[in-house]
Amino acid sequence: MSRRRAHDTEDEGYDHRRNKRRRVSENQEIEDRLESLILRVGERSTSSVESNLEGLVSVLEADLGTFRLKILRILSDCAVRMPEKCTVYTTLVGLLNAKNYKFGGEFVDHMVKTFKESLKLCRWDAARYSLRFLADLVNCHVISATSLLQLLDTMIDVSNEDTVPQVRRDWFVFAVLSTLPWVGRDLYEKKESALESLLLRIEVYLNKRSKKHHNALRVWSSDAPHPQEEYLDCLWAQIRKLRQDNWAEKHIPRPYLVFDSILCEALQHNLPQIIPPPHHDAFEYPMPWVVYRMFDYTDCPDGPNLPGAHSIERFLIEEHLHHIIETHHYERKDCAAQLLNFPFKHKIPLEYCIVEVIFAELFHMPTPRYLDICYGSILIELCKLQPGTLPQVLAQATEILFMRIDSMNTSCFDRFVNWFSYHLSNFKFTWSWDEWDSCLLLEAEHPRPKFIQEVLQKCLRLSYHQRITEMMPTTYAKLIPLTPVPNYKYANEEAANLPGTTVAHQLVVAIRQKCTPEEVVNILKEIPSSGYSGEEMSDGSFNALKIDVFVQTLLNLGSKSFSHSFAAISKFHAVFRALAETEEAQICILHNIFELWSSHQQMMVVLIDKLLKLQIVDCSAVATWIFSKEMTGEFTKMYLWEILHLTIKKMNKHVIKLNTELSDAKDKLSKADSSSSDSDEDTPHKRKKPITHADKPSEEVVERMEEKLEAANVNQKRLFLIVFQRFIMILSEHLLRSDTDGRDPDTDWYRWTIGRLQQVFLMHHEQVQKYSSTLETLLFTSDLDTHILEVFQQFVALRA
């Protein structure tokens, strides 16, 4: 009998567990269905948005009792992650609030919490979208206009804070201004005087703020034909135009207007007092930017008009397109399809808007959000999806860029070169070059012939020399790159007269016979220590002829491909290290690479990158070599600056890596100490898994890591000091010589060089910022020429 009872109990327990699993499974299915319904509401379907909303409200109202928290979370997530559907979700919340006032209050509290968390965690876009959502809830009679105005006023209070960065004050003003298109009309009708007071406070702030950073962020130095407006100035002009139009805009869909009779009966909630978190030194705010303009209505053919530069519709369209790129940039095909599927495409010249926004992203200063190739690949997909119109618009844009290239920012010039060469490589290198042949009459350093020359160099990397030669008209012969072959001087006709030729030939035979590094060292010993005709460095630290013979011979033998060169360097790594003991010796190695491969820019880039990775040459040696007299003829060529930037990036990555490792080690040490101190107090059931001895770093290890990081920081600072000091020297010398000779200093060479200085500041702004006070003290002093000093001051203003 007892056995029977036990069996019955087992069956009951099994049934209970099975039913519980079934309930959990059913609940999960319902939650997934609710999430799917909420996410897809308002998307294109057979029924209208309004009927979709009505049906969804009925479903959600029935499930509020069981799935309240889930629904709250999904809706607040949608508010932040799908800002393009803001008004759809605010209408949904408004209808739910009209039926269930308690739920409406809970949602407002949840949204306020999301907003405050976003501010606290420096999630600035999420905070702005949350604020927009709260503002649009005023239109749906969920939140009172008075309490929203109090929040907006509190945010504008930040503009009066002292001793905080301007970028902080700017962001809070921008967040308020960018919210007004959604709620401005309602505030104008209900609280006109309070709205005007808010706008007056904003105007006062905008009139007194510094715009020292503006010139550093411009794509073009000229304002013709389109002004290069600072982002807050542009948005303020758009808001003023909207105010002149009595806050009536034509872009934002407002489904809540259909339900006005229902929504106006609902009780409203008041927002609690929200105080923005105070500034902290660790906070990073969005940097300012310049609004990019390429087209106006005169550039577009017959069809819908392009909204004016100061119409709020232009801001709303551009923001929406930027968000589509942000959401889909990992999938170029999806991104292109979504851009072409823009909801209001029949009201605007969509292709022009898309092309302008993509180039705005590509030319964004100080750096684009994504890799250059991301934008190039999206444009290619757009051309494939819309072959009838988009290639023509893109060709028109390219023509505009080329004609305005004289005043283009140097960083943007590089990006334009990289994009155009990549684009040509995907369309059989076809272009109407004859239309640009007027540039052949200009000086070689002028941006137009320089652009074509650099494009052809990049095309060479994506094709081969004969193909480049065949695709270009004969008139462009002087701009076509040289055939990329090594210039091995020990095989030339004059080689017999060169010191080291005999040893070079011995080395060729030995390497082909697969000799060891030790055998190479023995062969090089035959070169006398006096080197070139008795010439030697004053400190006797290296033998230039040994380096010359070894580097040129080895790399010439490995010239068949990158892989052959890499294999040669790796095999004789020890010989390189022995020869490159000093910075002067490393510079000598770099000079020999240039002498051998001066006609093959890409080979130089990849070889120097390899030498840096193998720590054969130091970053400081590369920087010094770039500014050496031997490289004067190459100074305005893109590849040289590509080498400098990859060198700086390598140093930056090294510092970041050491910083991360030290931080992790300190965390482990701290956790191990706290774990051991807590272990005696914890009961056996509460005791956590202890950190093992193997996981715990010793204090000595941490100290060594700190020393490594300190040394890396010193090297990084030294690298930047070398680069900026050399810039100051050559620019100051040019300005002084021009003044002495009575010549205009504003030459093409000067513009390229000052542009490269600015590029180093902006491309590596996060790292350079750490040393700004040192740079100001040692290099960028008040007695420096104002042209050079302004570049530094503009850089500092970016984070001021």
UniProtKB/Swiss-Prot annotation:
Keyword annotations: mRNA capping, mRNA processing, mRNA splicing, Nucleus, Phosphoprotein, RNA-mediated gene silencing
One Pfam family here: MIF4G
Lineage: superkingdom: Eukaryota
Role noted for this protein: Component of the cap-binding complex (CBC), which binds cotranscriptionally to the 5'-cap of pre-mRNAs and is involved in various processes such as pre-mRNA splicing and RNA-mediated gene silencing (RNAi). The CBC complex is involved in miRNA-mediated RNA interference via its interaction with Ars2 and is required for primary microRNAs (miRNAs) processing. Also involved in innate immunity via the short interfering RNAs (siRNAs) processing machinery by restricting the viral RNA production.
GO process annotations (BP): 7-methylguanosine mRNA capping; mRNA export from nucleus; negative regulation of viral genome replication; nuclear-transcribed mRNA catabolic process, nonsense-mediated decay; primary miRNA processing; regulatory ncRNA-mediated post-transcriptional gene silencing; RNA splicing; siRNA processing
UniProt family annotation: Belongs to the NCBP1 family.
Subunit: Component of the nuclear cap-binding complex (CBC), a heterodimer composed of Cbp80 and Cbp20 that interacts with m7GpppG-capped RNA.
Protein name, per record: Nuclear cap-binding protein subunit 1
Primary localisation category: nucleus
Keyword Ribosomal protein part of the UniProt annotation: no
Positions of modified residues (Phosphothreonine): 9
Record domain MIF4G: where: 31-243
InterPro entries per the UniProt record, alphabetical: ARM-type_fold, CBP80, MIF4G-like_typ-1, MIF4G-like_typ-2, MIF4G-like_typ-3
GO molecular function, one term: mRNA binding
Gene (name only): Cbp80
Species annotation: Drosophila willistoni
GO CC terms in record: nuclear cap binding complex; nucleus; postsynaptic cytosol; presynaptic cytosol
Localization in the cell: Nucleus
